[in-house]
Design a protein with these regions (language model features):
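Membrane-proximal, proline-rich intrinsically disordered regions
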Residues: 20-68
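Short, surface-exposed recognition loops and adjoining beta-strand edges that mediate ligand/DNA contacts
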Residues: 62-82, 203-218, 225-311, 481-494, ...
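Conserved, well-structured interaction surfaces
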Residues: 39-59, 81-160, 177-184, 194-207, ...
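Elongated scaffold/linker segments in the mid-to-C-terminal portions of large proteins
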Residues: 59, 83-109, 250-448, 525-536
Length: 541
């Protein structure tokens, strides 16, 4: 009887054993698996959306990565000198063993997020031929957009880290044998890819996605990096032909007092205004398109403004605590409410004397972008003594403008007392009533103003000072600065970039690119009186 039962059980199990392989064959549980997603242009653009999101994160948030690109140049320093391990002591903190991806610095962020962007772009590139398209133009537009995203990362990585691994396809299995490639070869490949992208990516794309002229701007940068200045100029002329500068007041801000064209150009309204011809490429955060969280707030006021609310740092002339985030309740949203009028900063990104003073001379007296214009820039003396304790004690300084202390300490002058470009960094946050630090907004990645400055630099390398000045003067004229003429060089290009592109450009990347070009071309640097002969041989000093 037991034998019979065993035979029956065995016969019952046999079919199950035969179907075992079917049980173990994994089936995707999600409609969004790669096999179900990357089947058409829309699916592949979804992969590139991850690239666009990471582009936004470079500019947004407390201690945004773009600040590290500013600390490592002539326009800003890390203001938190009281925080150990921050990017203040560069000799020790920029070593390979001291990589950072926190509030103290973000050099590691560029490495990690750079290769993440390359990974997402390579997914679209590798899966391109497995999808269906309505025509060749749609296919090539997707490929061009992916090429843009990959080149966007490699342009930065090759100038931040030099020779790096080059990945040109999706990695689908564990891989440990990565090797660095020559940076020049990587840039040449990116140039080839971007020529394709510039041909095929449409001129009109949804805001936040790379369009034809965004591809053109990046192509210009890479042409400049490899020394092809004529091609960069040719592309630049085409781009500015399609994207003229905004030279007249626009947006609803034009009716507000104490504003000018620069306030219009850098307002939230301007960056969502489809008639804004100057904007070429944006990263996008807006309550209608992105979740409301700290990663989607720009935090420009927190990062760039002085730490005016630091306890005890700002005192009245009679020695009392002078400022507070919130004034007396009766004085909220008035002239003495520094928080709502200017924003609450913590002095993370402190502008240098070069950016505050040295680049603003007699020719910039009427420049709308500079500190001579008191609507565009703010000083600590514009703020008010507003600590509620002053009002309670009937202190006569309550509500008065700040007075520079005669005994201002070095520490306080670094983090708590300096000028700043209010027009550029003031971003309202309608979701908050206090502690305003910079809300949601689109942000410029590329503008045609930069294209003119890039063409000016190309003419510098070609030794054509006349056209160099002409390109710079297009941007200067719009801002109200006097024209440049005569013997100008790289210093004028870099000063104009600082005036125009604060908190927009990857200035460290651009300075490294220029350094490589001096080495590649052998052209003497007139700004420092240096040439290749000073550095090319170990015996020379």
């Amino acid at each position: 009887m037991n034998k019979k039962k065993c035979m029956i059980l065995a016969l019952a199990v046999l079919p199950m054993l035969n179907s075992c392989s079917d049980w173990l064959d994994p089936k995707p549980l999600s409609f969004y698996s790669p096999e179900n997603t990357y089947v058409d242009a829309a699916g592949l653009y979804a992969a590139l959306t991850a690239c666009e999101r990471n582009m936004r994160h470079e500019f947004f948030g407390d201690g945004a990565p773009i600040l590290t690109e500013m600390y490592l140049t002539d326009i800003a320093v890390h203001g938190k000198t009281d925080e150990s391990g921050s990017l203040v002591d560069l000799d020790n903190e920029m070593l390979p063993s001291r990589t950072k991806n926190d509030m103290k610095g973000k050099n590691k962020w560029y490495w990690e997020e750079g290769f993440k962007g390359i990974k997402y772009a390579n997914i679209a590139i590798s899966r391109l031929d497995g999808a269906e398209y309505k025509d060749e133009a749609e296919r090539n537009a997707v490929l061009g957009a992916a090429y843009f995203q990959r080149a966007y990362r490699y342009y930065k990585l090759t100038h931040q880290f030099g020779d790096v691994p080059y990945l040109d396809k999706e990695i689908t299995e564990p891989k440990l044998d990565f090797y660095s490639y020559d940076r020049w070869s990587i840039l040449e490949q990116c140039k080839k890819d971007l020529e394709f992208a510039y041909q095929w990516v449409p001129e009109v794309q949804p805001r936040g996605r790379a369009n034809k002229d965004a591809c053109g701007v990046l192509l210009m940068k890479i042409c400049m990096a490899v020394g092809d200045f004529d091609r960069a100029i040719a592309v630049g002329k085409e781009v500015v032909g399609r994207h003229p500068l905004m030279t007249g007041r626009f947006t609803g801000n034009q009716t507000k007092p104490n504003t000018n064209l620069m306030h219009d150009l850098h307002s939230v309204e301007a960056k969502i205004d489809m008639s804004n011809t100057e904007g070429i490429m944006y990263v996008v955060a807006h309550p209608t398109t992105t979740p409301l969280d700290k990663d989607n707030r720009i935090y420009t006021m927190r990062n760039a403004l002085p730490y005016w609310a630091k306890g005890g740092a700002i005192k009245t002339p009679d020695g009392k605590t002078g400022t507070a985030i919130a004034p007396d309740e009766a004085d909220k949203n008035t002239e003495i409410d520094n928080d709502t009028k200017y924003g609450r900063g913590i002095g993370t990104c402190r502008p240098t004397n070069y950016y505050q003073y040295e680049i603003w001379g007699e020719k910039e007296k009427n420049d709308l972008r500079g500190p001579f214009n008191h609507d565009s820039w703010r000083r600590m003396e514009d703020l008010r003594y507003n600590d509620p304790g002053l009002k309670k004690t009937n202190n006569p300084y309550y509500g008065q403008n700040l007075i520079r202390p005669v005994d201002l300490s070095v520490a306080d002058s670094i983090r708590c007392w300096y000028m700043w470009p209010h027009y550029k960094v003031f971003v309202p946050d309608p979701t908050k009533t206090q502690d305003l630090q910079g809300g949601e907004t689109p942000w410029y990645v590329y503008r045609s103003a930069e294209v003119y400055l890039m063409m000016a630099e190309c003419y510098y390398w070609k030794g054509d000072a006349t056209n160099e000045a002409a390109m710079l003067n297009v941007v200067r004229a719009r801002a109200g600065a006097e024209p440049l003429s005569g013997n100008i060089g790289i210093a004028e290009v870099l000063a104009e970039r600082a005036r125009e592109l604060y908190y927009e450009e990857n200035r460290h990347v651009e300075l490294v690119r220029i350094s490589y070009l001096y080495a590649k071309t052998g052209k003497p640097c007139e700004a420092l009186g240096l040439s290749l002969i000073h550095i090319s041989e170990p015996t020379r000093h």
